[in-house]
A protein has these predicted regions:
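Non-heme di-metal
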Residues: 4-197
């Protein structure tokens, strides 16, 4: 079975899923990662990129819904739901960062302007699909490292909960974009021509 099929089976066995609620009111220090400011800020920057990144993944894979089988459509719905919740949770934490005095808007506006204002509109869907599949595997690889080593064990418990939950779901759906990407056995030429426009 592919990882995508296993995800369907896991969701079926667990029944309905409910969004996890987060409260970051007790986070009061910017060096929440066990006093390590550098790592804290690295993951803070990651958080700032998550909401629009997740929206990009959803926009990209929505192009596949009309040609998907019933099982594939269910898989896409699961993927969309998980990614949307990731964006909402990280947006909530980003708001907390602003409350603590971090000026996040210039960074977010610059990154989103480059990636989604300038680059996304000129990229064919095949290239966007390849980008999503690649980033999802990077996320899953990072998630395996973080979770297997319990890297956030000394971090603030509420921030740790956010990232461990997010990373667990990244591992869970890491092959969704990849499985759709290779469905038609694409070549490099395909990336620049498929679903162009």
């Amino acid at each position: 079975d592919s990882a995508s099929v296993m995800l369907l089976k896991k969701v079926d066995s667990c029944g309905a899923r409910f969004p996890i609620e987060f409260d970051f009111s007790s986070v009061r220090e910017l060096d929440w990662f066990g006093g390590n400011a550098a790592i804290s800020h690295w993951f803070d920057a990651y958080t700032l990129l998550v909401p629009e990144n997740e929206a990009f993944y959803i926009r990209t894979l929505r192009n596949l819904v009309s040609s998907a089988s019933p099982d594939e459509k269910r898989l896409l719905r699961i993927f969309f739901g998980q990614e949307a919740r990731h964006g909402e949770a990280h947006r909530l934490y980003a708001h907390k960062m602003n409350e603590m005095g971090l000026a996040t808007a210039p960074f977010v506006e610059l990154a989103n302007g480059i990636f989604y204002g300038a680059l996304e509109p000129i990229q064919p869907i095949g290239l966007r699909m390849a980008t999503v599949a690649a980033i999802e595997h990077v996320n899953a690889s990072m998630a395996h490292i973080v979770l297997s080593k319990d890297m956030f064990r000394n971090a603030h418990s509420d921030v740790r909960r956010l990232f461990y939950w997010h990373f667990a779901e990244e591992i869970e759906h890491k092959c969704v974009a990849h499985d759709f990407l290779v469905r038609d056995r694409p070549s490099y030429f395909w990336f620049f021509t498929r679903y162009r426009g």
